[in-house]
Amino acid sequence: MSAGTKASELRELGDEELLNKLREAKEELFNLRFQAATGQLENHGRLKSVRKDIARIYTLMRERELGIETVESA
């Protein structure tokens, strides 16, 4: 995933693609945490952005589950 995937980009994805993005983000978060624990992590801000991406994906999945439509502001 890129550094901070936008919610509007995620809304364009299907359910299966969204699950794949979630799986990739969780795997990346695991690897980043491992690097941080061993002192090899250079970009600590990446941890925060990956966690936020995961939260965006979960939020979007919940919105779809509840049938909530979001209105994009201009």
From Swiss-Prot:
Q: Give UniProt keywords alphabetically.
A: Ribonucleoprotein, Ribosomal protein
Q: Does the keyword Nucleotide-binding apply?
A: no
Signal peptide coordinates: none
Q: Which GO terms describe its biological process?
A: translation
Q: Which PROSITE patterns match?
A: RIBOSOMAL_L29
GO cellular component labels: cytosolic large ribosomal subunit
Checking Pfam families in the record gives:
Ribosomal_L29
Per the record's keyword annotation, is Ribonucleoprotein included, yes or no? yes
Q: Which GO terms describe its molecular function?
A: structural constituent of ribosome
Stored InterPro entries: Ribosomal_protein_uL29 (IPR050063), Ribosomal_uL29 (IPR001854), Ribosomal_uL29_CS (IPR018254), Ribosomal_uL29_sf (IPR036049)
**Family that this chain belongs to:** Belongs to the universal ribosomal protein uL29 family.
User: What HAMAP family does UniProt report for this protein, alphabetically?
Assistant: Ribosomal_uL29 (MF_00374)
The name on file for this protein is: Large ribosomal subunit protein uL29
Recite the lineage of the species: Bacteria, Bacillati, Actinomycetota, Actinomycetes, Kitasatosporales
